[in-house]
């Protein structure tokens, strides 16, 4: 039987070197910054500590059991969200693990649709994250109401481009 907590730890535990790339609503890089993420289990608690290397600022997220909003697949990939910011705005996060590499996406939707995407490239300690060239400009194509962003080869983000305003 699939144990999401054990699977999450099996594939995500360790020290990850990363590069966060902030994209605007058109898939154009706004800025990027290096990070370090430590994922470990201590006394039954999963501890995640993200360090922004340029400033030394740290953010932590700790939990004993997998949050009810988190889905974990057998390969260690996970999704978290959507988390409501306001009645019409939300954010969601998705992670895909492939061996010692991982890609994460944090998408923020506002009142009128997509506001911002943070594309995260991570490699387990011992390797440098292989971030896309600067500045990143996603290749974009449409398929009906969907927009497909391609930040790098073999990675596609399927986004709902419909306007969300009420009225």
Show where each model-derived region lies.
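Soluble ligand-binding/transfer domains with enclosed cavities or grooves
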Residues: 5-13, 17-167
